[in-house]
Regions:
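N-terminal acidic leader/helix
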Residues: 2-33
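Generic structural hydrophobic/aromatic packing signal, biased to beta-strands
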Residues: 16, 36-38, 70
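Generic alpha-helical propensity signal that fires on short helical segments
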Residues: 22-25, 39-41, 52-56
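Acidic, low-complexity, intrinsically disordered interaction modules
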Residues: 28-49
Length: 78
């Protein structure tokens, strides 16, 4: 699993989705926590670092669409 980045941070996932990063898998834990899995690459690592440092700008409508899209996936695949 070295080449897989996993996160349950919904806003990070929405940000990455807004930047056209595709997740490979969604895992559900026993406590209903959802974990998104991405293939690691340089572009993903840069986006995550910039997100953590508050250096990203995302178009608001694209971010809102990503949130809605992800919530639909989460709640329709229970």
């Amino acid at each position: 699993m070295k080449n897989i980045f996993q996160t349950s941070d919904f806003n990070l996932v929405a940000t990455l989705h807004s930047l056209n990063h595709k997740f490979n898998e969604i895992k559900r834990e026993d406590n209903n926590k959802v974990i998104f899995c991405f293939t690691k690459n340089t572009h993903l690592s840069v986006a995550i670092r910039k997100y953590q440092q508050g250096e990203l700008c995302i178009e608001p409508q694209k971010f809102a669409y990503s949130q809605k899209f992800l919530k639909t996936i989460i709640y329709n695949n229970r």
